[in-house]
Amino acid sequence: MTLSSLLFASLLLVSKAETATPQFQHALPNVAGKKLVSVVVDYPPGAKSAPHRHAPSAFIYAYVLSGSIRSQLEGEPAAKIYHADESWFENPGAHHVVSENASDTQSAQLLAVFVVNTDEALTVPDAH
């Protein structure tokens, strides 16, 4: 087996997961116990987030910076694809059952802005 074949095979074994990078966090001085947090989520081609819940206090604004994101919250009839420059809102405690790159060939990037209690995690993965 050639070196390039081995490298390609090892790439296929790597899990395609998103990467969330905090960009900003600041306590809201006029709203006691709340903070504003922004996170950029990078999705390689074909990457998916594990199902998760958002904090019970978190109001979320999501904006697609590039590519296309497929998203579905519990109770929605089907997943929706959001393209670059499109956005949506998520209510506190939302259960994200689908959150993934809609493309297997292009990367996607999402900006998520949270208003959340200062003592809460932004997301909690579903129990397996």
Predicted segment positions?
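Hydrophobic helical h-region of N-terminal Sec-dependent signal peptides
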Residues: 3-12
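Sec/Tat signal peptide C-region and signal peptidase I cleavage site
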Residues: 11-19
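A short glycine-rich, His/Asp/Glu-containing loop-to-beta-strand
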Residues: 20-51, 57
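Short acidic-glycine-tyrosine-enriched beta hairpin
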Residues: 28-33, 43-45, 73-93
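Extracytoplasmic
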Residues: 33-38, 56-59, 77, 93, ...
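Short histidine-centered beta-strand/loop micro-motifs
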Residues: 49-55, 73, 80-81, 99-102
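Glycine- and acidic-residue-biased ligand/ion/polar-headgroup-sensing regions
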Residues: 57-76, 84-86
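Ligand-binding loop in jelly-roll beta-barrel domains
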Residues: 70, 78, 94-121
